[in-house]
Amino acid sequence: MQRLRGLAVCMLGFFAVCLLGAWVAAEPFALQEPFPPAKLPVDTSFLKELMETRSYQAGRPTNTQPTPDGSAVLFLRSEPRSPTNALYELNVETGQTRSLLTPAQVLQGTEEELSPEEKARRERMRVTARGFANFQLSPDGRLVLLTLSGKLYVFDRNNGSIKSLPTGKGTLLDPKFSPDGKYIGYVLDHDVYVLDLATLREVAVTRGGTEVVSHGLAEFVAQEEMDRHTGWWWSPDSRSIVFEEADNREVEVWSVADPFRPGRSAFTQYYPRPGKNNTKVRLGIVPVDPERFAAQEADSTAKVPEPLWIPWDMEKYPYLATVKWDKGGPLTILVQARSQQEMVLLRVDPTTGQTTPLLTEKDDAWLNLDQDVPHWLEDGSGFLWSSEREGHPQLELRDASGKLVRLLIPPSAGYQPSYAARGKGILGVDEKRGFVYFRGSEDPTQTHLYRVSLRDGNISRITQQTGLHSAVFSKDGSLYVHSFSGPKTMRRTFAVRIEDGKTVPLPSTALEPPFVPTTEVVKIGPDAGFWCAVTRPRQFQPRLRYPVIVDVYAGPGVQRVVESMGSYLTAQWIADQGFIVVSVDGRGTPGRGRDWERVLRGSFGVIPLEDQVTALKALGQVMPELDLERVGITGWSFGGYMAALAVLKRPDVFRAAVAGAPVCDWQDYDTHYTERYLGLPSENPKGYEESSLLTYAPKLARPLLIVHGTRDDNVYFVHALKLSDALFRAGKHHEVLPLAGQTHVVTDPQMRTRLQERTILFFREHLGSPLPGPAAR
């Protein structure tokens, strides 16, 4: 689950008569004071540009990949108002950039087409770009592997040629170069295939895969909740493939029909809900035998070798969390208990399939998954491992048997693993020079680049400028690509040569925002305090008291308060309409240690909301310009849930809410996410009841606008329908705004613009305009 913005608008009169219960006869809301809605029209010109430029990210380099020798950097970039990415290359020595390939050159006048499976996979990965969504470099850096409209292409950097690869018919997903660069593997119609680049012969390495029992594809919860988006892996010598078999025969099937397009077939999905059956997963190993390519070309029905199945205690550890087969290291898998309170790292013998435990992690609440580890050293002597067992994330060096060699990054150093670092935590490992590069910060509103010595654990900080820093390192450790955004700076990207510090900017064609947000990041409240972001109007008048809009997420895995200009562009536009916008990272959000995060265990319905209220009151004590008698709240996904919960449980604080794609009943969300925090429904019925919006529906006493995409395949549209139905039956006045044909990731620029406009009109109506009051600070 993830907070994502973007919604749409329909005529309000339509919802007065629709069957969703958009308007329900009930007693009028009783505000303490009548605040007349502002009559001024909403200027959406900035919003239109914001959406057309993808929040001013279009035109900025993305998916940066240094060549193995560090001589060049390849990257994707679109035009300033386009979602379509093309491929570029920066020469580090000369600083010159050249265009390598555009989608138009490949498609030659035809339109890009995505299969339903590819659309769903991109949804899981939160990829919204068109054209080239990503690419891969061959191990020697000469070839570039790309997909477009479900077809595979190889671009040769040496001669500029583009070749379409002859693959079988069907839906093609997840292509990868083999480590020796001779083959490309991929999933085709639920089975794993390999293409020989020298002969262009294709061979199936698995058979019998179907939509019900698939080979090589990660199951839904692995993609959505474990950050594992692949279901097959090459061996380091390119002679074997390990693949996942996902058996969905006992999993519930949910359908996503599009009422806006009744002639279109429903999209079905295996969707495991709390307490119900999960996908059954097992791992098999199959050989990649060059002699079979010619034989199978002659007889496409020829049998494939029977997989060597890897046994482990699947009853105790049903989740396959991580699979690693690094150069120099053994095949290693991380399996997890359904409770997510225990997981074991297993070493696999690829000749017998037998497993040996390397280490076990336990936590009374839950264990976070870090997809950066284990990271095996190339000499096979040991691996990197991260843990929170001492209360904060730490990085360890362990030997090949799993025994601790030394603590590389102590809990006090602010290490930010992948689940807390908005991306990778381990950025690069330079074994030749003996360094591990990583992200971290003692301040959770920032991320910085560090390096630690593998030999003595000495840590040094690389970046100093306030903001969010990230990097991608070349294979030889000679160069890294540094991306940075700050409180007054949109994302910038540079190639940095480590030996001499030579820094070359990757050129951007992006438009720049017309303003810098006024956002103030403060720490406030009792005890450890809460990080808050406060955005005032650019024409702020200290002698006025402003209605407040809380822009909320407040759930696991997401921080709203960060030192990055791009995070507050929409908040600034909202503030300029006559509001002060506040975001609060309370307990349960990442970046502040195990105990801070684990307080959520057992219930979503209490602590996150308490912390929003506590922080608001603390802000009001020092910022009298905040009119806490007029507070609205809005959010998306978990934030939408929090917005609805706020007006249902605390109408004394929150006077109106816009709830986007809210989870209404946690028994209708997926297993891995929900059970991590709430446990099984049979073991924690009180927690599920306490966390359900349906429990509080009869208590609604404030204006509520529910917004939801009708084709949402993450938080299904049924959540909005259930909540509206409960409110309707309780006689509670509310509004529902369905976003026709949209999923959980709403990408339509017009819809997103109109939704923000509708949100402002809603809050103007129910919160009013700034009023004279006591002087502010």
List each language-model region with its residue ranges.
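Beta-propeller folds
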Residues: 10-13, 19-470, 478-479, 487-489, ...
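Compositionally biased, intrinsically disordered low-complexity regions
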Residues: 5-7, 106, 554, 737
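Intrinsically disordered, low-complexity Ser/Thr/Pro-rich tracts
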Residues: 7-8, 426, 660, 666
